[in-house]
Amino acid sequence: MIARRLIQSATPLEEAGLLQVQAVGVRAPFFFPLGMPRDEVEQVLCDILKPDQWHYYEIPQTAVRSEDVVADCGAAEGLFTLTVAHRCRHVFAIKPAPAFVKALGRTLAGLANVSILPYALAESDGAVRLSAGGITSRVTDAGDGQVVPSRAIDSLFIRQGRRVDYLKADLEGAEISMLRGAIETIRACAPRIAITTYHRREHAEQIAALLRDIHPDYHIFVKGIMPQDGRPVMLHAWMDDAA
């Protein structure tokens, strides 16, 4: 299996309740909750490290720059934050599930320009329920999930005087809700955006329409095709002065 060749070592840290994973070709280790199934770890690494995957966020028009403040929405295992932290001003890594927030803290330890925000992202502030889906847990109406605090991007950023120059998002289907809670920030900052669209068939068109409603001059580029049903994988958006 290709993913297995991406794992150099996997070391349980029993006292910390974490699994330390060294990926081939990545200098820093990743940390996952100790009980995370091996096949899920392998799939995560496959998605982010295989060269033929469409699950990458930077293209020339949406590349991270040295003065950028980056919102990593759905920071997951922390690879995107690790990749860009050394070449931007600051990264806010946002992830709600407590077990993964703890793991993310170990993965990103020592990076002075990284802040972890332990929230789900939604249209408004409050609380949401997460499914028990591990790293791919998502907002659910089912009664057996974990309740976590939710925040709107606008509450975390523009209303606190923080700008956002780059917005990266993979929220397991909650992307539209996040964007509706980010309208003030997007209107004020016009960030470059890279956002997943494959969780729901209709999201590529809906996200493009929402962004152009906020800023009609946004350029939109959609890339990648899910082999199962042809859904696009990623949407990139940028303004002319960001090209």
Q: What is the meaning of each model-derived region?
A:
Residues 1-243:
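Phosphate/nucleotide-binding beta-alpha loop and adjacent structural elements of enzyme active sites
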